[in-house]
Regions:
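ABC-type nucleotide-binding domain
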Residues: 344-596
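Extended non-transmembrane interhelical loops and adjacent amphipathic helices
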Residues: 1-16, 95-142, 204-247, 320-333, ...
């Protein structure tokens, strides 16, 4: 019991947190939703409880048409005013407010995502919350206002009808109280049963969802056409459906019984009270008019439904609060990697690794062990080794996407932690192995910022990477839209062409340190040779880190580091390492045989 109360207040606190966020983004949206709910409740009560009873009483008592029309016109004026308020509010407050709120919440999420430690991507529980927050949080926070609208509506309805019934007939209050207690108890039992049924269905539903994805995702399109796996999937889908039917059948009898009891309690309470009112009207005179009979009966019905709805608000608040909590937890998460540096970056970008070791968060396996590197500005460094050697992890530390478990990385004489992370990363430009072409123009894909594009420089970089023949065929030059994400006429490129764009992006920047992870993986040997020499000449005064499996790239490096199992096992120039006849020489000669 105590745990349930704590969970409720926690969910309620989360809802208030979400409402504050929304009010800050669009106060007019919140005010409109609350006022609309209150006015809607009053309008419904006016029509179903008071106006109908008033008209019947006027007819029964022989009142003049003018007398009745005066009050009907007042009611009509109220409804007209409410309609005008609703029409203007929908456009001015509701629709605009939704856009403002979505924009505000999304920008907060994007800003947090950019600043979030990379280590959080390695935590599956946090990553699930992160994905949910990015995809669904704004929608669910807006949906929570539908709950607020409902709460205000039933609260106003319950308050008005409660006062009205209490002042007219105390028996009605007793009838409502008994009805509500039974209905709430039945509802709680039914909800628990439905939750249990949903939990039992979940494994089968998950399997059906997976099969559904297999048939519409592009990733599986070729496999299901070139194999007989579809027969097995059909069989599994039918089996999962039958299992779900079994779960539903198992729980359906009790749920039907509870539903019938709920209906019976409602019917007995309301019809019983109607009999009481009619008895008072025809025999005792305790109810003066037929209009009062209709009015009190409708009021009791509304009061009963409103109080039952308010009782059911508790699980709705808990459920909605859980959704909001995910976004709150995501935005409130503190980075494990502090950004407390205040020093200005030195003129030279000389990087040093001093006895650096590293293990990914949550893992006891050491990925890098006692790494020592000296990378003066302007040097050309190659990191080589087989998959899993630790090359990509090493450059992630260099970019300060992670901090070392032990040892330090220095820029000049200071630990890189002494510098603001954003300032430090501004001087690094990276071509990742899994680089992405953005759904934007070619020019925007090269500049990767919102600053005015230096078109001549962008064209020069594209030319240096050998992209010019493709560029000359483009309909709109640097303004050509890439990918078909937003434009059916968008242009898509081959892997090699896309890689040339990505390399142009790196060269276009003014960064002092360029990190190229497999820069020529999608290129033919001739293009690779030309590109490597072009990069080397163009970035003569900038540091370049090459990560490569194809060792033809490494020949232009000033120094080569061979990694294995997270350790540097060999270092030197290409010629020095060939003379040593170690692992590097063995790897190089094996690759050279492919071109003989």
């Amino acid at each position: 019991m105590l745990k349930g109360i704590k969970e409720f207040f926690k969910s309620f606190d989360n809802m208030l947190w979400g409402y504050k966020k929304v009010f800050k983004a669009s106060p007019e949206y919140v005010i409109y939703k609350v006022l609309h709910a209150a006015l809607s409740a009053l309008q419904d009560l006016l029509l179903s409880v008071f106006l109908l009873a008033f008209v019947l009483s006027c007819i029964e008592q022989g009142k003049s048409f003018g007398y009745a029309a005066k009050y009907i016109l007042i009611a009509a004026a109220f409804m007209t005013a409410k309609f005008i308020f609703e029409s203007i509010g929908t456009q001015k407050c509701l629709n605009r407010g939704i856009e403002k709120i979505t924009r505000s919440l999304s920008l907060q999420l994007y800003d947090k995502a950019i600043k979030m430690d990379m280590s959080f991507y390695d935590d599956p529980n946090f990553y699930n919350d992160f994905v949910w927050a990015m995809n669904d949080a704004p929608t669910h926070i807006l949906l929570s206002f539908d709950l607020l609208h409902w709460i205000v509506y039933v609260a106003v309805s319950a308050a008005v009808t409660g006062v009205y019934v209490a002042t007219q007939d105390a028996v009605g209050v007793i009838a409502v109280a008994v009805s509500v207690v039974f209905r709430v108890v039945l509802h709680v039992i039914a909800v628990k049963k439905e939750v249990k049924m949903a939990e039992e269905k979940k494994p089968f539903q998950r399997k059906r969802d997976y099969i559904n994805r297999v048939f519409y995702l592009n990733d599986f399109a070729k496999d299901i056409r070139l194999s007989n796996i579809k027969d097995m999937l059909f069989k599994d889908f039918k089996a999962s459906s039958r299992d779900m039917e079994g779960v539903i059948k198992k729980h359906s009898k009790l749920l039907v019984f509870l539903s019938q009891c709920y209906y019976a309690v409602t019917t007995v309470a309301l019809n019983g009270y109607l009999v009481w009112l009619l008895y008072g009207y025809f025999f005792t005179g305790s109810v003066a008019t037929l209009g009062m009979v209709v009015s009190l009966h409708n009021a009791i019905s509304r009061l009963s439904n409103s109080l039952t709805s308010l009782a059911n608000v508790l699980p709705a608040i808990q459920r909605t609060g859980l959704y909001v909590e995910k976004m709150r937890r995501f935005l409130d998460t503190k980075n494990l990697m502090p950004d407390e540096g205040t020093k200005e970056l030195p003129e030279r970008f000389d990087v040093k690794f001093k006895n650096v070791s590293f293990a990914y968060p949550g893992s006891e396996k050491t990925v890098l062990k006692d790494i020592n590197l000296d990378i003066p500005q302007g040097s050309k460094i190659a990191l080589v080794g087989y998959n899993g050697a630790g090359k990509s992890t090493l450059v992630k530390l260099m970019m300060r996407l992670y901090d070392p478990t032990s040892g330090e990385i220095a820029l000049g004489d200071d630990n890189i932690k002494e510098f603001p992370v954003e300032d430090y990363r501004e001087h690094i430009s990276t071509l990742f192995q899994d680089f992405q072409i953005m759904a934007a123009t070619l020019g925007e894909n090269i500049s990767m910022n919102d600053q005015p594009l230096d078109e001549e420089r962008a064209k020069e970089m594209l030319d240096l990477t050998g992209f010019t023949p493709v560029y000359n065929r483009l309909p709109n030059g640097l303004n050509t839209r890439l990918t078909k994400e937003f434009d059916d006429e968008g242009t898509s490129f081959s892997g090699g062409e896309s890689q040339k764009i990505a390399i142009s992006r790196v060269l276009y920047s003014d960064a002092k340190l360029l990190i190229l992870d497999e820069p020529s993986a999608a290129l033919d040997p001739l293009s690779e040779y030309t590109l490597n020499h072009t990069i080397n000449e163009l970035a003569a005064d900038r540091t370049i880190i090459f990560i490569s499996h194809r060792l033809s790239t490494t020949r232009i490096a000033d120094k080569i580091y061979m990694l294995e199992n997270g350790q540097i096992i060999e270092e030197g120039t290409h010629d020095e390492l060939i003379e040593k006849k170690g692992k590097y020489a063995e790897m190089f000669l094996l690759q050279a045989q492919k071109y003989r």
